[in-house]
């Protein structure tokens, strides 16, 4: 018998005084952790299957369950942590690349938490958002350097297509296939209700969701899955995905187990086949090639839709953004290294890319220095966790923010980081009909509306406290920010002063 070096990560603690053996946990767990033992007349658990999704804990009618981290410990070693040792065991057992989902969980600096916001006191009165108007409306797209009027006072400057947002927040790209039909419906309906946008991701747009096109951003990625004329015409904007924060430099991969039924038809690939996106776009090897695709998409959409270029936050991101701003693109979306994903190689997710805070500040400053900041809007994502992160991002230079993981949390995600298995017990990252139906889009979209509405209220309160009454006045206003515990170089890149200055 071979020795199994892979110990369970979690322990299922069942209170026998509370457990009534109703078997709800058994029915609800897609990982088959729980079972009823007829001989023992009790519930038992196979803890090696547990991913800590908390479905059983939430559904238990008597609160008899809790999931705890196992106390299996190796001899303490600052270099070789228990997690690192287990990863070596896993690869020695399988011979495969380690896969993970969601964003980078490593204890690297979170710069949002080291930046503090200003508030008005005495000499500069604050504004009460309950009694005075606050403008959170945002327009994304190219802006003219000056406005010209004719002799009658009418504007004669050509204004390029713009995206109008009621609040500077959008739902980031999550493809149909990586997440469920019901999750997509929740996002689309919430975007329509809020007056913002959701992004289809690289899996095409289900025919049922074309009616939400006015609040939809359609994506064109290297695999070109589901891309056709009607698809490009359906959305309010077109996004070219050049990179993703969770896995810069590589393409996407959706396993064949998720390519079923409508997912297959929407992506226009055979059922059961793996959807593998190439690392590069095979028609883009330069800024000139990118410009050609930008204008091809503009031509295909009769120049009525803004074109977004999405890139990962990498070391030379400012120079890359400078080139994109000259390519004819209307919006640049930058995805930080903590950005979520349905599946990515663990080593790439945890070691490639840079924090979105530094990337945003560097890009905004570079475009300003070159006098081309008005040529593009900047949208940032990659772990925007709260309204405070949104305010700080806008003060650093962003026009709007993408949220993905926060939106999934609102739908019930518990960050068990097992999206790649397709067994999501919350009906989000799965295509199994019995699991998908657990996410009710009538409830899901309302929870998303509640989340963004709550953030909007908080944004207004923070802006009012600063004595600012519009997003326009906050954008790039780095004087409203101060750093804590940052070194001189970090402060220089962020373009902010240290607290106390």
Identify the function of each model-found stretch:
Residues 3-6, 75-81, 85-118, 342-357, ...:
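Conserved active-site-proximal phosphate/metal-binding subdomains
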Residues 8-10, 21, 26-27, 31, ...:
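Glycine-rich phosphate/ribose-binding loops and adjacent secondary-structure elements
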């Amino acid at each position: 018998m071979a020795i199994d070096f892979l110990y369970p990560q979690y322990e299922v603690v069942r209170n026998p005084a509370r457990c009534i053996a109703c078997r709800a946990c058994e029915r609800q767990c897609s990982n088959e952790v729980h079972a009823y033992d007829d001989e023992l007349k009790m519930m038992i658990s196979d803890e090696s299957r547990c991913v800590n999704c908390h479905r059983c804990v939430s559904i238990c009618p008597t609160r008899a369950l809790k999931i705890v981290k196992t106390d299996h410990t190796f001899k303490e070693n600052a270099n070789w942590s228990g997690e690192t040792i287990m990863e070596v065991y896993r690869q020695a057992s399988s011979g495969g690349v380690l896969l993970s989902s969601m964003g980078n969980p490593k204890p690297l600096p979170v710069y949002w938490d080291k930046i503090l916001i200003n508030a008005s006191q005495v000499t500069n009165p604050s504004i009460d958002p309950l009694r005075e108007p606050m403008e959170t409306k945002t327009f994304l797209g190219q802006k003219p350097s000056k406005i010209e009027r004719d002799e009658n006072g009418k504007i004669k400057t050509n204004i390029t297509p713009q995206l109008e947002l009621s609040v500077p927040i959008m739902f980031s790209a999550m493809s149909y296939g990586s997440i469920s039909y019901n999750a997509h419906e929740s996002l689309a309906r919430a975007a329509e209700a809020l007056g913002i946008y959701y992004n289809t991701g690289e899996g095409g747009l289900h025919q049922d969701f074309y009616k939400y096109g006015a609040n939809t951003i359609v994506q064109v990625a290297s695999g070109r899955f589901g891309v056709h004329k009607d698809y490009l015409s359906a959305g309010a904007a077109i996004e070219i995905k050049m990179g993703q924060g969770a896995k810069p430099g590589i393409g996407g991969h959706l396993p064949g187990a998720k390519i079923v039924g409508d997912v297959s038809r929407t992506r226009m690939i055979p059922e059961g086949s793996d959807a593998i996106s190439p690392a590069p776009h095979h028609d883009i090897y330069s800024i000139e090639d990118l410009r050609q695709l930008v204008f091809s998409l503009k031509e295909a959409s009769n120049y009525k839709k803004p074109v977004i270029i999405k890139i990962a936050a990498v070391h030379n991101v400012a120079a890359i953004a400078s080139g994109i701003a000259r390519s004819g693109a209307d919006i640049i979306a930058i995805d930080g290294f903590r950005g979520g994903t349905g599946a990515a190689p663990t080593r790439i997710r945890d070691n490639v890319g840079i924090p979105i805070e530094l990337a945003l500040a560097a890009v905004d400053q570079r475009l300003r220095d070159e006098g081309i900041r008005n040529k593009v809007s900047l949208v940032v994502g990659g772990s925007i966790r709260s309204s405070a992160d949104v305010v700080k991002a806008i003060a650093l230079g962003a026009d709007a923010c993408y949220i993905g993981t926060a939106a999934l949390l609102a739908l019930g995600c518990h960050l068990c980081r097992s999206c790649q298995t397709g067994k999501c017990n919350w009906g989000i990252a799965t295509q199994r009909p019995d699991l998908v139906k657990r996410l009710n889009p009538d409830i899901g979209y309302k929870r998303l509306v509640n989340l963004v509405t709550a953030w909007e209220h908080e944004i207004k309160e923070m802006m009012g406290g600063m004595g600012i009454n519009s997003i326009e006045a906050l954008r790039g206003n780095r004087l409203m920010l101060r750093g804590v515990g940052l070194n001189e170089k970090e402060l220089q890149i962020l373009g902010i002063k240290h607290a106390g200055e």
